[in-house]
Amino acid sequence: MIIHHQFDPVLISIGPLAVRWYALSYILGFILFTFLGRRRIAQGLSVFTKESLDDFLTWGILGVILGGRLGYVLFYKFSDYLAHPLDIFKVWEGGMSFHGGFLGVVIAIWLFSRKHGIGFLKLMDTVAPLVPLGLASGRIGNFINGELWGRITDINAFWAMGFPQAHYEDAEAAAHNPLWAEWLQQYGMLPRHPSQLYQFALEGICLFAVVWLFSKKPRPTGQTAALFLGGYGVFRFIAEFARQPDDYLGLLTLGLSMGQWLSVPMIVLGIVGFVRFGMKKQH
């Protein structure tokens, strides 16, 4: 079993200011978005100009942060934040939702398209290939922080990883399983899937490869965005089987996690959109 290193979440401290790994992962994601966006502009495969890309980045950042935070509040801990509404603003304590961030970016794209007279679906197609590497960067941030770890796996599995940060969850799980209790006593922690790395590979690298390569050729308007939508939903749904469900939610109907249920509409809409848009002429 590999033991997680327990990195210090703060990379650099300068007086009262602290640069955190997780914040750095977001910054890297935005840098990658800009780099890929400019490459697509140079290839003539974008509705952006260099100036409008920089302008959109501001809109996108707001969509990610506001949507991600509100999504976490609404989808995962609504009752807690309803009782303590001021805690919503304590973003330094963590708590972001991809699905909320996705909706926030969609709203930003819609507003930006109206302001600049760009077709909404064409803008969605342009943005979609630029996003997955940013998601990959975010999952590396999760891994460095030792958060969002996976479910318990076999002690002899080559991928098994112990997360010291999960000591409370390990003890709680061991109390209901004699074998896990034995492992915990012997090794001091339980073997878990490094699900952050699975999500890095699936939602980040694999999704990027699929959407980027698909969008290198002219496609019917909306089809690239639909591929991203459905592709993310499928990869997230699969990865959730290895990810530990949120302790305050657990597994929901049909034994699925909240992340899986939020991905189901993405899969359905992605498939329907991909087929319907594919019936139209290429843009």
UniProtKB/Swiss-Prot annotation:
What is the annotated localization of this protein? Cell inner membrane
Where does the sequence pass through the membrane? Answer: 17-37, 56-76, 92-112, 222-242, 255-275
A GO molecular function for this record?
Answer: phosphatidylglycerol-prolipoprotein diacylglyceryl transferase activity
Kind of enzyme, top EC level?
transferase
Tell me the PROSITE patterns matching this sequence.
LGT
How this chain sits in the membrane, per its record, is: Multi-pass membrane protein
GO cellular component: a single term: plasma membrane
- Binding positions for a 1,2-diacyl-sn-glycero-3-phospho-(1'-sn-glycerol) per the UniProt entry: R139
Q: What is this protein called?
A: Phosphatidylglycerol--prolipoprotein diacylglyceryl transferase
- Which gene does this sequence derive from? lgt
